[in-house]
């Protein structure tokens, strides 16, 4: 399965713990080492120290719509995009709806292994 990773410098405003991009990449690499069925195609990263940074996030979304990969891996939902509305729109309503899966390591979500209702409930709980 072709997958990509996404990391960013700053989490959502309401999240207190801090993960560096290096720490996010380490967690993703460890997961990939255990899951040989996943083939990392590309790493997207918004490195600007700006809450609104989203150039890589937007490029990942566009590439996903074009089906350049099958799955996105992130260390934490709080580092999955610039804010919850953007993530919900891009991941849940756009990419997931077209068959792109999402693996969120910290929260233990793998949309390959759960029902659509469980995904809906997960995003609802993050609101």
PLM segments and residue spans:
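Short, structured surface patches at the beginning of a domain
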Residues: 1-127
